[in-house]
From Swiss-Prot:
Subcellular locations according to the entry: Virion
Domain Helicase C-terminal: 417-599
Name the UniProt record assigns to this protein: Termination factor NPH-I homolog
Source species of the chain: African swine fever virus (isolate Tick/Malawi/Lil 20-1/1983)
SUPFAM superfamilies, per the entry: P-loop containing nucleoside triphosphate hydrolases
Length: 706
């Protein structure tokens, strides 16, 4: 069976296909079959196996032939997108060259997941190194954040022709494309290379598509379709698909028609939700700035406003270029209110940065007296909340020097010890981690097949550590192993982990009980990504039921009330930058969430999972959309709702096949005929335009009914 996504029959065909795959999945799980497909059925979750089958089946067509080139794997964070993509890479590596594009910090995650997958696939093998080496040789890794990404791709395979391209954290690529002012950026060059590639299969992995703007969909689905499926210009896209008055999707039915067949979604099924810890309602701490902090904040705002005024008008007459967000030309030089946002976290008169001195060094040289509740009411509030946590705690800030490093100094003053790796040494199956107090820490590899764990640490000291973009991958992996150790269920080894945006990507953490987000961001999906580092499938399985909860906190700096009301009326900014970012994020989140709901409705598993609002059409084999999006908007919607009804009909046999018919005076020729469709396992109406229709009328009128 081959299915083409630009066809009204596609939705019912894919639903029927997935039902067959699911039955096969249940059979293979109980079998002793040693084929690769059977092995994957015993390893993968059912929702992973559905996509594995649909994508790898040469007869079905997802990502092949006249169909789309691949899928947006929109699976809730923590549901195993990495394992799914590696499974497909292994299965298809004899046909396509696997190329993984991901932030450099995530490459080791994929390599570790690959070893884990091989162990699960071949449990009868004791030495997995040969199989790992054999499979690893087929993989090529490219750093999404590298300045020479294009050269890495050429080195990896010469071109993207004939490759299976896996892009992890794909939302970063989509944003990079639409934030580019020209075609010279890495992201835009990759977009052009993908669009020009031949015989390419694509897997875009993300738990947060459409997180910045719905316009992110344009590069995503153009690359997946291999053509200009969605309009390249921001204004044309918004005119066609966004109702700015209601802040909601416009022409949603026509957009759904274009997207169907290119999305896999998994995330809100009840049986899956049971595997996650309970996320408690977000606690928003609105923290009043101290007088000195607010004074410095106002000075920073004056500077930012002056810079904004100086640059205003420079781009007013510039039309938005293709694949660009409005203002992306300016944003490359924008401060994004960095000064005022950092001061909202920490402000001290003692902080001075000398020429050629790094900000982090200046923070380290500050005396203990600089770290008080007055210099950072936010951090003081956060520390009080942390003391109530019964288990490990995750702290996030996008600011490292005046965010995480300041928090680290506060923690040290409070008596916490920083477990900071200086060197990681491999010794057989053991790993030695040298940290800054000079003592050796012996750690057994915490793999599932390693039953014993050796840890040399004082239980009297409460520890914290940091993961930022600058940390080496081996150190990052070791910190994750320590956090996930069965000996760290309640934070006995690492109580607090501080992470930046880059540092948080790809982390898979267990046991976490609190998440602290030190400042709001206008992209609420980022907050979800941070929480998803510890809210994952099975992450709290080792804890008793009453401890399987995660409490998130968000900290928002507000004006010092006494000083605010002393400012002449009309001169005050009514809301702080923190408040404005938070409110803008909520507003933007509403629109982005509505478009993510459309992606769920267009997902190939939607009807199979019994979701509501799924795109399901009468299987008339008509084109689902016109290639020209403007003309498509003017045409009637070819997707007529699929309605299943029982009718009384007569049976007729013609040329060895069974048909049914009704006498129907409302039809021009007086008959309605039905034929069996094996794909959807139901009878569908034969249209009068079908040549078979006239033949069946003559057959009935000749009196040969059965």
């Amino acid at each position: 069976m081959s299915c083409v996504h630009n066809n009204t029959s596609f939705p019912v065909q894919i639903e029927a296909y997935l039902k067959e795959v699911f039955e096969k999945y249940k059979e293979l799980q109980e079998s002793k079959d040693t084929s690769l497909t059977a092995r994957f059925a015993r390893v993968l979750k059912y929702y992973q196996f559905l996509i594995y089958s649909a994508f790898s089946d040469p007869k079905f067509g997802i990502g092949q032939g006249e169909n789309t080139r691949g899928l947006l794997i929109y699976h809730q964070m923590g549901m195993g997108k990495t394992i799914l993509s590696l499974s497909l890479a292994i299965s298809l590596s004899h046909i396509y060259n696997p190329i993984l594009i991901a932030p450099k910090s995530l490459h080791s995650n994929f390599q570790q997941s690959l070893l884990k997958l091989i162990k699960l696939l071949y449990p009868e093998t004791t030495d997995h190194s040969k199989e790992l080496q054999k499979i690893s040789r087929r993989f090529r890794f490219v750093s999404l954040d590298a300045y020479n990404m294009g050269q890495q791709i050429i080195k990896a395979g010469g071109s993207l022709n004939g490759c299976l391209l896996i892009v992890d954290e794909a939302h970063n690529l989509f944003r990079g494309i639409i934030n580019s002012a020209n075609d010279k950026t890495n992201a835009r060059q990759l977009y052009n290379n993908i669009m020009q590639a031949k015989n390419i299969r694509i897997l875009f992995l993300t738990g947060t598509p459409c997180s910045k703007d719905p316009f992110e969909m344009v590069p995503c689905f153009n690359m997946l379709s291999g053509r200009i499926l969605l309009p390249l210009h921001y204004e044309r896209f918004y005119t066609a698909y966004v109702n700015k008055t209601t802040n909601s999707p416009l022409n949603a039915d026509k957009l759904l028609n274009r997207l169907v067949g290119m999305i896999s979604y998994a995330g809100n099924q009840n049986e899956l939700n049971k595997l996650f810890p309970t996320e408690l309602p977000l606690i928003i701490e609105k923290v009043e700035m101290s007088p000195e902090q607010y004074r410095q904040y106002l000075l920073a705002r004056d500077v930012e406003n002056a810079e904004k005024h100086a640059s205003s008008g420079m781009y007013e007459k510039m039309n938005t270029a293709a694949l660009c967000l409005p203002g992306s030309e300016q944003e490359s030089g924008s401060s994004y209110y960095v000064r005022s946002r950092m001061i909202s976290i920490f402000a001290s008169e003692m902080l001075t940065v000398k020429e050629d001195e790094k900000l982090s060094e200046a923070v380290q040289q500050l005396p203990k007296e600089a770290f008080t509740e007055n210099s950072s009411p936010k951090i003081a509030c956060m520390l009080k909340n942390i003391k109530t946590s019964p288990g490990p705690v995750l702290i996030y800030s996008q600011f490292v020097e005046l965010g995480l490093h300041v928090v680290a100094r506060f923690l040290e003053i409070e008596g916490y010890q920083c477990l900071q790796p200086l060197k990681v040494l491999e010794e057989g199956h053991n790993t030695i981690l040298l940290h800054k107090d000079g003592k050796d820490l012996m750690v057994k590899n915490f793999a599932e097949d390693e039953p014993t764990h050796t840890l040399v640490l004082s239980s009297k000291i409460t520890r914290f550590t940091l993961i930022t973009g600058k940390i080496l991958s081996k150190e990052r992996d070791m910190i994750q192993q320590l956090w996930n150790s069965p000996l760290n269920i309640h934070g006995e080894v690492i109580k607090i982990l501080l992470v930046s945006k880059t540092g948080a990507e790809g982390l898979d953490l267990k046991y976490g009980r609190q998440v602290h987000i030190l400042e709001p961001y206008w992209d609420k999906a980022r907050e979800d990504q941070v929480k998803a580092r510890i809210i994952r499938i099975g992450s709290h399985d080792a804890l008793p039921p009453e401890e399987k909860t995660v409490q998130p906190f968000l900290y928002i700096a507000v004006a010092n009330q006494k000083m605010f009301y002393s400012i002449p009326e009309g001169s005050q900014e009514q809301k702080t930058i923190d408040e404005r970012f938070h409110e803008r994020g909520l507003e933007k989140s509403h629109l982005n969430s509505a478009f993510r709901d459309l992606l769920k409705r267009a997902a190939i598993e939607c009807a199979f999972n019994g979701e509501s609002g799924c795109l399901m059409c009468q299987p008339t084999n008509a084109l689902l959309f016109h290639e020209n999006f403007e003309r498509d908007l003017r045409l009637p919607n070819p997707c007529q709702p699929l309605v299943k009804t029982e009718v009384k009909a007569y049976s007729i046999s013609y040329e060895g096949k069974q048909f049914f018919y009704q006498k129907n005076k409302e039809v021009g020729l007086g008959y309605t005929f039905y034929e069996y469709n094996p794909i959807i396992k139901a009878y569908i109406e034969i249209k009068p335009s079908n040549p078979l229709y006239i033949k069946l009328i003559k057959h009935v009128q000749a009196g040969t009914t059965v």
